[in-house]
Design a protein with these regions (language model features):
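Generic alpha-helical secondary structure signal
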Residues: 18-22, 65, 112
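Tryptophan-rich aromatic "cage" segments
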Residues: 109-121
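Segments of small-molecule ligand-sensing domains
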Residues: 30-42, 52-111
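Extracellular/periplasmic periplasmic-binding protein-like sensory domains
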Residues: 1-43, 117-119
Length: 121
């Protein structure tokens, strides 16, 4: 079984010493009552990091116009839980945050990357 993925998976041993994963687990221990290895929880945490980025860039101007300006002008933004090298890029005509990923294969125990970082449309 193969798939494509763009983020670090906190359930996998290879990421246990990663500073971003350690920070995520510390946050989860304090604020999250569910399973911190759950992919939905990790995804929510990543979305919250993106929202924090946007709000910081907006500063005191939280108008819809300014929020949309920031959201649609992200250039090479890296978030801690994204797979190394994955960058977020958006524009006024392309809201899709990233087209970068690695191919992963299930080895019977966990998903293992088997390609370098790829870019696709």
């Amino acid at each position: 079984m193969i798939s494509a993925y763009y983020a670090k998976d906190p359930s996998q041993k290879r990421w246990r010493d990663d500073p971003a994963i350690k920070e995520y687990f510390a946050w989860a221990k304090q604020y999250y009552v569910g399973d911190p290895e759950d992919g939905i929880a990790t995804y929510g945490y990543q979305v919250a990091q993106a929202l924090e980025y946007v709000l910081r860039k907006c500063g005191d101007n939280l108008s819809r116009e300014n929020v949309m300006k920031v959201v649609t002008s992200m250039k090479d933004v890296e978030f801690p839980l994204l797979y190394p090298g994955v960058k977020v890029n958006t524009s006024a005509t392309d809201y899709h945050p990233s087209r970068q990923f690695v191919m992963i294969r299930f080895d019977g125990k966990e998903w293992v990357p088997f390609t370098e970082l790829l870019t696709g449309d």
